[in-house]
Amino acid sequence: MEKIQMTTPLVEMDGDEMTRILWKMIKDELLLPFIDLKTEYYDLGLEHRNETNDQVTVDSANATKKYGVAVKCATITPNATRMTEYNLKEMWKSPNGTIRAMLDGTVFRTPIVVKGIEPCVRNWKKPITIARHAYGDVYKNAEIRIPGPGKAELVYTAEDGTETRELIHNFTGAGVIQGMHNLDHSIESFARSCFEYALSTKQDLWFASKDTISKKYDHRFKDIFQEIFDAEYKEKFAEAGITYFYTLIDDAVARIMKAEGGFIWACKNYDGDVMSDMVSSAFGSLAMMTSVLVSPHGYYEYEAAHGTVQRHYYRHLKGEETSTNSVATIFAWTGALRKRGEMDGNAELSAFADRLEKATIATIESGKMTKDLALITTMENPTVLNSRDFILAIREELEK
C-alpha cells in the first residue's frame, strides 16, 4: 500500500509515563503504516526537560510558530513528590502553561461522543466545547498571608509616579489576600480566537463571567468581547447563521444543564479549568476529551485533555497488563494531521484523519473498548481490551 505523503512536518512533542507508552503504540500501529510521517521531534518528557533546563519546551513552542501545527503528548507538571522522584534541578513550570503563554493561545476542549456512552445530562445530544482563556487570573496571582491587624490596599504606580489606591480590607485579625491581573491584549486575543473558532466550526458562541459583582475586572472581559464582536464579527456571524451570546456565569451553568449542546462556551481561566472537567466527566470520561490550543496568529497545538495516567504507568513498569484509554491521544494526532492537511492543501491527509476517527468510534460502538468505558457503557457484555489490543482493534477497523 502506498503511504500518504506529507509536505510540511508536524511539531511532535513527546511526553511522560503511560501516555508516552501509548504515543509510540499509536505511531507504530495507526500512523506509520499509512503515512510517510514527517515530524520535528521534541522530547518533553520530564527527564529531558530537566536535562535541558526546560529549554526544550521553549524550543518546541518556537517550532510551532515556525510550522503552524503541533501535536503534544501529556506531560508531568512537577510537584514536591516529583522533585524527589525524578531528582529535578528545580520545580519546572507546566509545559502547557509555557506553550500557551508563548503562543498567546486559547484552549478549546471538546468531548468525543459515541453511542453507548451516555452523558449524565440526558438532554445533551451534541458536544459542548469549552474555550478557556489561558492567561492570568489566579494562575498569575500574588498572595499574602495576613498575620494580624492592619490595612491591605491595591496600589498602582504609573510611570510618572502617580499612585492609585483602592482599599481591600481593614484587617482586625489574621487573614489572606490575593491580587490578580489580566491584559487587554490577551483578552482581545482570547476573544478573536473564540470568534474565529466559532466561525470555523459553525457553532454558536457563549461567553460568561460575573460582571454584576466584578464591575471592573469581569466587566472588562465583557466589554472587549462585545466591542470586537460588533466591529469585526457581527456580519460574519450573521452570514454563517450563528450567534454570539453573553450571560452571567451562574445563568450559563443553569442554561447548560437544559441545552442539547452543539455550541462553544467561552470561560475565563479558572472557570474554564473547572467547567471543562465538569463537562468532560458529565459526557463520560476525561479520556474522551480533545484539546486544541488555538492562537490568533494561526498556530494550532493538539493534545489529549487528560494527564499522564500515572497509576497505569507504575503497573506497566511492574509488567502488569493495563487497559488504558488512548482515544483522546489518537484524536490529538488526527486533529493535528487534519489541520496540517488543510493548511497544506493535502486532502488525502485530512481524509485519513477522518477515517482514523471513524474507525476509533466504530471500534467502541462495536463493543470493543478499554476498561474505563466498559464500566460506564450502556451496552451489554462489552469486550474489555488491554491498551495494545484496543489500538490493534482500531487498526483492524481502519484496514477494512
What are these regions (language model features)?
Residues 46-60, 222-263, 267:
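N-terminal small/polar loop signature for handling phosphorylated ligands or for N-terminal nucleophile
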Residues 256-355, 359-366:
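Glycine-rich phosphate/nucleotide-binding loop
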Residues 35-41, 201-209, 233-246, 341-353, ...:
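Flexible, glycine/charged-enriched surface loops at secondary-structure junctions
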Residues 2-8, 18, 22-23, 28-53, ...:
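N-terminal alpha-helical transmembrane segments of multi-pass membrane transport
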Residues 47-159, 163, 270-274:
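N-terminal glycine-rich phosphate/adenylate-binding segment common to multiple enzyme folds
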Residues 134-135, 140-191, 198, 343-346, ...:
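Glycine-rich phosphate/pyrophosphate-binding loop and the adjoining helix
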Residues 6-25, 29, 154-247:
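Glycine-rich phosphate/diphosphate-binding loop of Rossmann-like nucleotide-binding domains
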